[in-house]
């Protein structure tokens, strides 16, 4: 029987796609860039590629945060400042939280019966702010964010550092719940714990390739 439940945050509990689109639109306007739907989609694709490179160990977090905007503005041939855009985007993202349908009720139902933990690859300042804004922080015994741990999902180091901080932890009673095959599911399998893949409507339209 499972006792330790690890939850991913973005697109598992909170709708990151929606928060991202709103934050990017506002940041673009600050830069004098018209936030068309096509540009928002293009940013999302560029951002996803950069986070995948982080998961593969090809980029650092600091490189991802600025280079995604630098790459996008180069593709669009727009002379905007990627550093300033990243700063504006982060400010707007900090205050944006939108629940995946049923997520809050699920946490409320599970918290009295299981030990809940958050396991996120997001930036610490942003994720901590969104957790506070959403009011779901108290459901978790501990919040594990890759920037604070010094390791990213799916690396075994991320999970081992989480496990080491949990009293009486038993990997046989642990379950990772997340939407990403490459970071959540692959990471859990590599760390020797069970995994539950959350396939939301956000991903239905995207090609799915098993990452195991």
Q: Language-model segments: what does each one mean?
A:
Residues 81, 138-142, 170-174:
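Short acidic capping loops at alpha-helix termini that bridge into adjacent secondary structure
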Residues 2-101:
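N-terminal helical cap/lid subdomain that shapes the substrate entry/recognition surface
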Residues 84-87, 92-96, 103-134, 140-146, ...:
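Substrate-recognition element of Asp-dependent hydrolases with the DxDx(T/V) motif
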Residues 202-212:
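Single conserved hydrophobic/aromatic residue that forms the stacking wall/gate
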């Amino acid at each position: 029987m499972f006792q330790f439940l690890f939850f991913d945050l973005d697109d598992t509990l909170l709708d990151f796609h929606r928060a991202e689109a709103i934050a990017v639109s506002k940041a673009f306007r600050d830069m004098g860039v018209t936030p068309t739907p096509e540009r928002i989609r293009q940013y999302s694709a560029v951002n996803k590629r950069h986070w995948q490179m982080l998961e593969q160990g090809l980029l650092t977090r600091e490189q991802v945060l600025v280079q995604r905007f630098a790459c996008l503005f180069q593709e669009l041939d727009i002379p905007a400042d990627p550093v300033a855009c990243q700063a504006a985007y982060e400010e707007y993202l900090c205050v944006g939280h939108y629940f995946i349908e049923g997520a809050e009720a699920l946490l409320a139902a599970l918290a009295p019966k299981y030990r809940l933990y958050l396991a996120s690859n997001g930036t610490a300042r942003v994720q901590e702010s969104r957790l506070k804004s959403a009011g779901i922080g108290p459901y978790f015994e501990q919040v594990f964010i890759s920037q604070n741990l010094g390791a990213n999902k799916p690396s075994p180091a991320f999970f081992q550092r989480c496990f080491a901080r949990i009293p009486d932890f038993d990997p046989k009673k642990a379950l990772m719940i997340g939407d990403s095959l490459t970071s959540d599911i692959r990471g859990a399998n590599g760390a020797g714990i069970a995994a539950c893949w959350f396939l939301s409507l956000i991903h239905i339209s995207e090609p799915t390739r098993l990452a195991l």
